[in-house]
Amino acid sequence: SILLALLCIKGCRVIKLCSQKGSSLLTFNYYRAAAHANLPVSSEITGYTASAFAYLHSRTGEHAYLDAAIRTASFLTDTAWDSASHTFPFEPGSDRAYFFDLGIIARGLMAVYRATGDERYLSRARDAALSLGFDFLGDGCFYPVISVPMKEPLPEEPRWSRKPGCYQLKSALIWRQMGDEHADRMFQVALAMALATHETFLSDEPSMETRMDRLH
């Protein structure tokens, strides 16, 4: 069996990733330790895991990791993607989508594409990159979260994930990986925004450790 335990403790929340032997696909979700309850499948965390399995295969050459990467990427491509709204919702069936999540998912798909050469993953990564550019671009910022299927920006909240900021550059890297002129221009826009705002991002958070945690 394959077991990937990636624990990220944030207050009472723990991310618990695992797969059982013989499962037809790999999906991952948040686990709330205090409540002893799994949340629905997280497309973002599944995207991170696709990248992790592809990396493990590149380092070890073990086919089990490649197989896990393929099954994870196939779930993202075939199930998590919402063809009606042409984007990746926060969770399958969710009524919102996050800029940050889309970039992480697309980069995971690109990692598996590089490992396999399967054009399905490249095509879906491009779809996600297009959604980032068309659905989230605002006036001087990229909206952190939009409604699905209407794709209207949702009001900002006093949480890092509900505000635009330099952390979005991590997801915008997918535009560099696309390798075309238009995508590169979008990355340059995101880079300029990050450079212009990084000094004030989370400026109201007194703990440097907490700031770094939020930037992950």
Spans of features found by a protein language model:
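Glycan-recognition and catalytic cores of secretory/periplasmic carbohydrate-active enzymes
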Residues: S1-H216
